[in-house]
Amino acid sequence: ELKLPIVGRDEDPQYGLAFDLLSSAMEQVFTGHEDGLITLDLAEGDDVHREQLRVEMDEPYRTLLGHFRHEVGHYYFYRLIGTNADYLQRFNDLFGDPDADYQEALDRHYSEGAPPGWKQNYVSSYATMHPAEDWAETFAHYLHIRDTLDTAAAFSFAPANATFDRKQLGP
């Protein structure tokens, strides 16, 4: 429905989409994205574990599905935006430089928190951390909104034939 290309490892062994579904119950797991590989911590499916992390990270909410949406956003940045000079310039204009020092931004975010007034321009406090995270958080929130509309349509709370016609992006 979104007309986004899904390129797997079978088609692109280096950057195709793949998943590592691991559990921090057995080993340390970091949710993240690298070169098309999305790693998710299945232990976050446990309510108590996830809630402990949510409180520790000072997040208003935290879900495994939210992490999935967020990391898929990183994948689509590299698949669609990072490979197109025009899209990359538009990204820079809207979100900032995706090549800004990530570790520096991460350290600043966890030591200082989100800047005052962040709610005026960002979908989450984490989005303030770095342009790449702003994109991924925005993408995740968009998918969340779309899922909500699809659910509403399935229960006749919205027009079932509503479409969001757009030009297909990507190669």
Where are these regions (language model features)?
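Flexible glycine/proline-enriched surface loops and loop-helix/loop-strand junctions
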Residues: 56-59, 118-124
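Post-HEXXH active-site segment of zinc metalloproteases
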Residues: 66, 79-112
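Pan-zinc metallopeptidase signature
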Residues: 127-171
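Active-site recognition of the HExxH zinc-binding catalytic motif
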Residues: 62-82, 136
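Short pre-active-site segment immediately N-terminal to the catalytic Zn-binding motif
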Residues: 48-68
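Active-site-adjacent bridging/hinge elements
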Residues: 40-51, 104-118
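Hydrophobic/aromatic-lined pockets within catalytic cores
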Residues: 3, 76-85, 140-148
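Auxiliary, metal-adjacent structural segments of Zn-dependent hydrolase domains
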Residues: 1-47
